[in-house]
Amino acid sequence: MLKKENFTEEHIRDLQSASHRDPLLLERSVYAFGLLEAITRVGMPFIFKGGTCLMLMLERPMRLSTDIDIIVAPGTDLNTFIEEAGKIFPFVSVEEQVRKGKNNIEKRHFKVVYESPVMERRIYILLDVLFEDAKYKRLIAKPIKNELILTDGEDLTVQIPSVESILGDKLTAFAPHTTGILLNSNKDMEIIKQLYDVMTLIEVAEDFTEVRE
């Protein structure tokens, strides 16, 4: 379990001193794992994916990420889970962010708000939820634990795709005429992040047959 000390300015400043990274980015990454643990504690069934997932998957993640991306089965009733997770320390409220969808893909987005010890104002972590039957070749259980967060007692675990499965997923970002990001769509930073993740995953992937599948 995550210790309450994670959510203090002292801990964030310690991380800043050790890594020379932006304190707000460090803070938001730590609080993202607080949100991940919160939705796990309330029993929400989900698969954890996306850039922040790599911070659990990789022994030494190469970049920080601050959003939580999950997949849930179609028809999952999220409201009670989200409401209860939003009450767990250090969070203070939840607000659904309504976006216009495309390609008939069912998604919901939530801003989960906390009091920032670094900025001394309210900031949110974004929870992106995709409703679909997961198509990953292989899933693994991973404890919520990495070099940024302090833990105590038994670690909660989450289901995540294998390195090879998430690499295959990330590669779809470069299929702009199907499931990926359209070129010249003012999303250069998103493409760069995906490319960086792909390069990192290629270095540790072992079974490229699984990537293709």
Predicted regions and their residues:
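Metal-dependent nucleotidyltransferase catalytic core
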Residues: 72-104
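N-terminal glycine-/serine-/threonine-rich phosphate-binding loop
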Residues: 2-9, 40
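Short, conserved acidic/polar surface loops in the N-terminal third of protein domains
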Residues: 58-61, 81-84, 138-141
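Active-site nucleotide-donor binding segment shared across nucleotidyl transfer reactions
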Residues: 36-68, 72-74
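Short, glycine/charge-rich beta-strand/loop segments that flank catalytic centers
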Residues: 51-53, 95-112
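Short, flexible active-site-adjacent loop segments at beta-strand->alpha-helix junctions, enriched
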Residues: 52, 76, 133-135
